Amino acid sequence: MNILILSSGTRNKIVQYAKQTFGMDGYIVATDSSKYAPSLYDADKYYIVPRIDHPQYLNIVLKICRDEKIDIVFSLIDPELELIAENINKFESIGVTPIVSPLKWVKIAFDKMQMHNFCVENSINTIKSFDSLEKVKNEIATKKINYPLFAKPKSGSASKNIMKIENEEQLDSYCKNQKDYIIQEYMDGVEIGCDVYIDSISGEVVDIFTKKKLLMRSGETDKAISFKDNKLFDFIKKFISKSGYKYNIDIDVYVKNGEYLLSEVNPRFGGGYPHAYECGCNFFDYIKTNINKEKNEAKVGHYNENIVMMKYPEICIKEMG
């Protein structure tokens, strides 16, 4: 099988892991808009492409798929997931399987208020969230929530334009300067990252890897430690059973008063996925099984606890003309 990894950026490990699974009977092609994306040089072949908002971007990607006889395509950045999901039929018509959830669920994942409402409607614990200043102030006045609060864009990634709100003056200022926002209760407890694989044939959860985040950097997990809790596994399975996600997704969860609360869902490989892979949760094997039209057997909780992941800088040296 030949794999196309879009917008690979600095995700060298993902390219390397894909090669370990698919490299024996296929090859890995990577793309990015910059020749200075180091992951390109871990692939068997690479293309420098326009940014994803270029009017010909999709046609360029489809041409690469045809020219390279690509079997599987996936992206590593949020803004591109919706583009792929919108055009699944175009990929499938040339024999390419996009590893992405259905468009409806990609859109819900990237609209934090929609995700909040979905969780509330399906009795899934989630963080209290509001999309209007009036609603927030009413909750404060009735003492249902208190300062500090947490503000962030309704859609977005990489922890951009987020703010801890300490008082009414900061609240008013943030809401005045941000067009689409949500205000949430502030969570200062343990944040947990969950790498989840959902079988694309059966719709069942195949694997879950959970880690407590020890340090974050630019919205990605920098240091974390693995752990297991059947209560958390059941919480995630309930969410998946109510939703329509498939393949690999990344879920962020908080703990409050002994209960798990869903925070966000990213329908792609999360920045902390290498932790899961190195602990034996090989989602590329699961993808390969599904592409071969076979179901994966569930193996939730098969990894070891107390395994720490610590990211560190690495360099790529290339001669360029």
Task: Mark where each language-model region is.
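Short, charged, surface-exposed secondary-structure boundary motifs
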Residues: 38-41, 56-59, 107-111, 159-162, ...
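ATP-dependent carboxylate/phosphate-activation module, predominantly the ATP-grasp catalytic core
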Residues: 184-244, 248, 266-293, 301, ...
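Active-site nucleotide/adenylate-binding loops and adjacent lid/helix of ATP-dependent enzymes
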Residues: 106-188, 200-202, 230-233
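A short glycine-rich, hydrophobically flanked beta-strand micro-motif that places a catalytic Asp/Glu
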Residues: 246-257
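Short catalytic-loop micro-motif centered on adjacent basic/acidic residues
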Residues: 4-5, 72-75, 127-128, 182-185, ...
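ATP-binding N-terminal substructure of ATP-dependent carboxylate-amine bond-forming enzymes
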Residues: 1-99
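Preference for protein termini
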Residues: 1-29, 68-69, 200-202, 206, ...
